[in-house]
Amino acid sequence: MKKQFAVMFCLLAIFTCLVGCSGKTESLFPSAFVRAVGQEKADALKTLGTTEQALSDYTVDVYGKTADVQLSFDAYRGDETSAGKLNYAELTVPCTPNGDGFSYMRTCYNKLEKALGEPFTTDVNMDGVSAEDDTDTLFAALQKDAGGENICALQYQWRGLGENESLLYLYYYPNEDGSARVKLTFLPKERAQIP
C-alpha cells in the first residue's frame, strides 16, 4: 500500500511540475527592451524560436547605438554586429479593407508602419526598387509580387552586411470576415538560406 502511495505521489509531483513549467517555455522580453520601446510595442512584437539572452544581446547591440530608441525598421535590420542574433521575430497587425486592393494594402502597411515606428523605408534594397524610392513605389512592388490569392509578400534584402546579411518579409493575410492582418518577419542569413 505504501509503495502504491509513493508511486501515485511521484506521478502527481511530475504532473504538477509539467503543468507549472509549461507556462515558462515562451520567451519573455528583457526589462531593458520593454523600457526602451515601451510596453505597448513590446506586447505587439511576438518572438518565436529565440531565447531571452539572444533577444537581449540583439537589443543591446541595436539600441545601444541608436539615439532615437524605437522599435523600427533599423531595429529589425540590425547592423554588422547585431544582425542574425534574433532567430525569428514577427509582428502582426489587424487592418480593414477600403476601396481597391492598393488602398487596402496601403492601409495595412500604414498600420504596420505605425506599430513599428515610422518611417521604415530607409536602407531598403530590393529588385528594381532603390533606397531612395518612396513608400508608394515599395508598396506597388509589394502588390505586384503577390505570391498567391491569400498571401502578398515582399522580400527586403539588406546588402553589404557580409555574413550577417538578412531578409525581412512582409506578408498580407486577408480574413474571411473582410478584415486582414499584416505580418513582418525577420530572418538571419543562415535561416533564410541566401545564396
Where are these regions (language model features)?
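C-terminal motif of bacterial Sec signal peptides marking the signal peptidase cleavage site
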Residues: 17-20
